[in-house]
A protein has these predicted regions:
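N-terminal cap/lid segment of alpha/beta-hydrolase-fold proteins
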Residues: 2-37
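The alpha/beta-hydrolase serine catalytic core
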Residues: 5-9, 16, 95-104, 143-276
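Short, surface-exposed "cap/lid" segments of acyl-processing enzymes
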Residues: 38-77, 85
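Glycine-rich His-Gly loop
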Residues: 46-50, 128, 231
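Short beta-to-alpha linker loops that shape the active-site pocket of alpha/beta-hydrolase fold enzymes
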Residues: 75-86, 153, 260-261
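Catalytic nucleophile-loop/oxyanion-hole region of alpha/beta-hydrolase
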Residues: 80-119
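Short beta-strand immediately N-terminal to the catalytic nucleophile in serine-hydrolase-like folds
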Residues: 124-126, 150
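Gly/Ala-rich beta-loop-alpha elbow adjacent to hydrolase catalytic centers
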Residues: 126-130, 134
Length: 284
């Protein structure tokens, strides 16, 4: 790996990776990028956020900046917003069709692959919505060596006030989505204002029915040290501070990068160095 030239993520522009296809327990295929290390005792599973992929955010820039450990960046089934899989036009996945109830299967497939590669200490690092899915895995796998939650999403209900500022419009959309699911049209799309642009009826119903406080409840099951990091320019700065105080134990760490935004532009190396220090303390 050379230090020059740099990519737009302030990392080396050329890094050797291997494309691998994983299989979830239910048979669905998952694409991932494997970044090898000379001695893969420690391996990090990178989980991206909504509308992202292995080519964006921490999943993209952290592996080249931490070459001493192995990395596996997985494309969640909700990667990007919409894409066709297989050869059938109707076989569509992506963020608009996100299935909140099965995302943990994507992570489990990645963890299993790391263990098959001989990785002894598996670390799960989730950014944004990936931090929600990482927390969802915590009650399901007590064998994870450490957790890294970067600007984590803590509820999937966040967009509601943006999509429907008028509560009555929100109620009408909720009723429509539930009716569509009852009619077997859960994969049909409902337009929304702003980004996502549209969401499937079934995915909207899942968001509506998400239990309050589920993220914090899940993080309470973590059986290994947790690093929770974010930038102090993010609007959820105060929320994350409060949540960290509620769950943190003696081995958990908080990282607040001054001036950093949601994607840590310009501070990629600072973030990587902080994660390396945390892992050195947490697992040696």
């Amino acid at each position: 790996m050379t230090e020059q030239p740099l990519s737009s993520w302030n990392t080396p522009a050329r890094v050797g990776v291997e494309l691998v296809e994983l299989r979830r327990d239910d048979g669905h295929p998952i694409d991932a990028l494997w970044y090898p290390a000379d001695e893969p005792r420690v391996g990090v599973l990178h989980v991206h956020g909504k509308g992202s992929s292995v080519l964006t955010g921490p999943s993209r820039f952290l592996p080249p900046l931490l070459p001493e450990i192995a990395h596996l960046a997985v494309n969640m089934r909700c990667h990007d917003l919409a894409y066709t899989v297989g050869t059938d036009d109707w076989a569509v996945d992506g963020g608009m069709w996100e299935d909140l109830s099965t995302g943990h299967l994507d992570l489990a497939a990645g963890v299993a692959h790391l263990r098959e590669r001989g990785v002894e200490q598996v670390v799960v690092s989730g950014h944004s919505s990936g931090g929600f899915y990482a927390a969802d895995l915590m009650p399901r796998d007590a064998g994870i060596a450490a957790w890294v939650l970067l600007s984590p999403l803590t509820t999937n209900k966040n967009p509601f006030p943006l999509w429907w500022p008028d509560p009555e419009d929100r109620d009408r959309a909720a009723a429509l989505a539930r009716a569509m699911v009852a009619e077997g049209r859960g994969r049909d799309l409902i337009p929304v204002s702003g980004w996502f642009h549209a969401i499937s009826a079934a995915s909207l119903v899942q968001r509506l029915e998400e239990p309050d406080g589920i993220w914090l409840d899940n993080v309470g099951h973590a059986a290994a040290p947790v690093l929770m990091g974010w930038g102090d320019t993010e609007p959820r700065h105060a929320l994350w501070n409060d949540l960290f105080r509620q769950f943190a134990g003696g081995s958990d760490r908080r990282l607040v990068l001054a001036g950093a935004d949601h994607y840590y532009r310009g501070q990629e190396r600072d973030l990587a160095a902080a994660i390396a220090g945390f892992l050195a303390d947490a697992i040696g």
